[in-house]
Every structure is written in C-alpha cells, then in structure tokens.
C-alpha cells in the first residue's frame, strides 16, 4: 500500500533467475538498454569486482541512449554490504515508533561524500520525508 504512491505495478518487470550470475547478466542488459531508469538485483552474496565493473560500463552505455537521467543499478547484498567497486554503500534499517513508522538510512561509503545518516519517516499521505 505504501509503495503504490511511488511504483505503478504496470511499469515493473521482475526476472527471477536461479543463479547470481544470471541476475547480474539481466541487470547488465537492462542497464545497457538505457530504457530502464532503475534496476535492482537481490543477491545472496557479494559480487566479484569484474561483474560490478561490467555493470558500471553497461550503465555508461545506457546513459547514452537514455533521454532522461542515466540508469541506476542497485545491488542488495547481505549484512552491511561489501561488494568491491561500488560507487556508494547504503544501509537501511527500521527505526519506527508506535506513532510514526520510519527508517534509518545511512550512507556508509561514497567516493565524493562523507558518511551521513537520515531518519526517514512516513507522512499521513504515504509519502516519505527525511527528518534529519
């Protein structure tokens, strides 16, 4: 219900490969196409540096074909992350009270920005706002 405000179900495509290498291939092809603004892969382990580099190159190619912003690739990995070669590393954890649902969003690593944390809270109209 919360995500309906942001994600139209008719505009999503799910691929469910069995192997991580196939998930990364799907992600690479989607990024390279330039027609998909965001690609998310949920992995059980950290990818090696070579596949991450391939994703970077695919996103650069996709940016040439995109009429809007360059495509964004998001790798969901266990724990606090640890994939080599990523541009940024984030951590999202629940941080709710009975009165207000929320999350703690932390930028753990970024090449051009220091670590930082935000408290993200849900507003009555199901939007989210950074509280800190």
Per-segment meaning from a language model:
Residues 1-132:
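N-terminal regions of ATP-driven nucleic-acid and macromolecular assemblies
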